């Protein structure tokens, strides 16, 4: 006799007096996006089946048949031969139906002591765990590329900005290492998130657990989980681990977006600090001269997309009572797209950073504008006994004078400087010009975390060691 699963297309058909409408089938089906969970679904099912056999809940023959059938199904999926059916709603029922078709009643016994509620929660955690590991590796690749570029430019000087106004000279290497720090924290957040992802829901069943004598710890060990979810209601209903991952991913993209904004500005002909390799740029269909930094621009845009996924998942969870609700089917597309977006972005950026051409002369010329060493002149006066606020006021006056004349502080002669700063003239000597050079300015910040070239090289070495390189 044909099973209800094959007769009506739903695993619960015997309860109802009429079949599901075609519109509702399309509305509720998830198979065409959750099929990417197929291989982890098979892994989870095999671990579950092995435990059932070990606990004498199913026979050794049933286990052998399940393992044989799953091996065939896995091969069909990997070769693109598996026929996904909308009528079977999701990845779980599609695989179960195929398994039953291949091995008969043994396939029907696989779901003993299990619900799709704990099954899908397990699948998502298994899948996400692997993706977190992959993203961690991609973050390391990007960090490595940034460290390489930073080491090459430990002595390259450019203006540092606050409020997009010239502030103080810094080295380009120091600037790049700021992003290494950001992406290092992102990697830490991913590792921290992974610890909470890596808990086994299987065994929670629908919501209350199961009456079968299962061994959840054995399944957890087989699947590489650090432990089990301690409460069955929580195990099947909460997606906070997905929200936490997406929040960490949103921070990754936020840091990428900040870097992207600078890349776009630096590549602008009005700035001209860098050039991005042609393979990462596009042209214009109407303007022949254009070379557009589309990759960093798109990354800025895709950051909003990931931020939107975070808000979608937060909103998805906020109104759900315990335990499982169908709302949770909507967790997958935002989660899947977040993973895809972050992974693609990191891979591209690591390659793009390695191909950046730096233009040191343009950077240096920009650093010579905007009185970037004014703070150094104030520090010079402070070191000779003047209170900082008085030094600040004196230098501000000198800047005003130079600005009106269209010159920089370093362009003043010693006599002119003393003339413009009569109240502190006795503190100013020939050595003042050592403080007003770009090289002198950055070299003086010679402490951990500072922009001095020696500190940049030391920081790059430490960052590389943290990567295990």
Curated annotation (Swiss-Prot):
Which compartments does it reside in?
A: Cytoplasm
* Catalysis: reaction(s): 2-(N(omega)-L-arginino)succinate = fumarate + L-arginine
* Pfam families to which the protein is assigned, alphabetical: ASL_C2, Lyase_1
Q: Which domain of life is it from?
A: Bacteria
- Gene3D superfamilies per record: Fumarase/aspartase (C-terminal domain), Fumarase/aspartase (Central domain), Fumarase/aspartase (N-terminal domain)
Q: In which pathway does it act?
A: Amino-acid biosynthesis; L-arginine biosynthesis; L-arginine from L-ornithine and carbamoyl phosphate: step 3/3
Q: What is its EC number?
A: 4.3.2.1
- Any Gene Ontology CC annotation: cytosol
The EC category is lyase
Under Gene Ontology molecular function, one entry of this record is: argininosuccinate lyase activity
The entry's keywords: Amino-acid biosynthesis, Arginine biosynthesis, Cytoplasm, Lyase
The UniProt entry's coiled-coil ranges are none
List the GO biological process terms.
arginine biosynthetic process via ornithine; L-arginine biosynthetic process
Instruction: State the similarity comment.
Output: Belongs to the lyase 1 family. Argininosuccinate lyase subfamily.
HAMAP family per UniProt: Arg_succ_lyase (MF_00006)
The record's section on NCBIfam families has: argH
* Record protein name field: Argininosuccinate lyase
Q: Which organism is it from?
A: Burkholderia mallei (strain ATCC 23344)
Species lineage: Bacteria, Pseudomonadati, Pseudomonadota, Betaproteobacteria, Burkholderiales
């Amino acid at each position: 006799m044909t099973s209800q699963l094959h007769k009506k297309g739903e695993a619960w058909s015997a309860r109802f007096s009429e079949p599901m409408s075609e519109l509702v089938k399309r509305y509720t089906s998830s198979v065409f996006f959750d099929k990417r969970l197929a291989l982890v679904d098979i892994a989870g099912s095999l671990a579950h089946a092995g435990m059932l056999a070990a606990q004498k809940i199913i026979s050794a023959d049933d286990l052998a048949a399940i393992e044989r059938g799953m091996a065939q199904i896995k091969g069909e999926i990997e070769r693109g031969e598996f026929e996904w059916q909308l009528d079977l709603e999701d990845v779980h029922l599609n695989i179960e139906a195929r398994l039953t078709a291949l091995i008969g009643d043994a396939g029907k016994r696989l779901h003993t002591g299990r619900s799709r509620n704990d099954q899908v929660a397990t699948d998502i955690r298994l899948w996400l765990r692997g993706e977190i590991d992959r993203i961690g590796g991609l973050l390391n690749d990007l960090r490595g590329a940034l460290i390489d570029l930073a080491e090459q430019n430990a002595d390259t000087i450019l203006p540092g900005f606050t409020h997009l106004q010239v502030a103080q000279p810094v080295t380009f290497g120091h600037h790049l290492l700021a992003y290494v720090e950001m992406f290092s924290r992102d990697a830490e957040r991913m590792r921290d998130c992974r610890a909470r992802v890596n808990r086994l829901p299987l065994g929670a069943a629908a919501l209350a657990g199961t009456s079968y004598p299962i061994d959840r710890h054995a399944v957890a060990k087989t699947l590489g989980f650090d432990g089990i979810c301690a409460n069955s209601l929580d195990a099947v209903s909460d997606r906070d681990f997905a929200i936490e991952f997406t929040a960490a991913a949103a921070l990754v993209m936020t840091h990428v977006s900040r870097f992207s904004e600078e890349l776009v500005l630096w590549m602008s002909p009005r700035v001209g600090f860098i050039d991005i390799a042609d393979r990462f740029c596009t042209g214009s269909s109407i303007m022949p001269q254009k070379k557009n930094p589309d990759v960093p621009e798109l990354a800025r845009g895709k950051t909003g997309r990931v931020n939107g996924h975070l808000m979608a998942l937060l909103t998805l969870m906020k109104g759900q009572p315990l335990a499982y609700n169908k709302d949770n089917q909507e967790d997958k597309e935002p989660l899947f797209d977040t993973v895809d977006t972050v992974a693609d972005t990191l891979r591209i950026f690591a390659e793009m950073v390695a191909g950046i051409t730096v233009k040191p002369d343009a950077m240096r010329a920009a650093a010579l504008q905007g009185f970037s060493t004014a703070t150094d002149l104030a520090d010079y006066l402070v070191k000779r006994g003047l209170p900082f606020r008085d030094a600040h006021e004196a230098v501000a006056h000198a800047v005003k004078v130079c600005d009106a004349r269209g010159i920089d502080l370093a362009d003043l002669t010693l006599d002119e400087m003393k003339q413009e700063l009569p109240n502190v003239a006795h503190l100013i000597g020939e050595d003042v010009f050592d403080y007003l050079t770009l090289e002198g300015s950055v070299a003086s910040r010679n402490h951990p975390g500072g922009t001095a070239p020696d500190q940049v090289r030391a920081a790059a070495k430490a960052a590389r060691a943290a990567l295990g390189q």
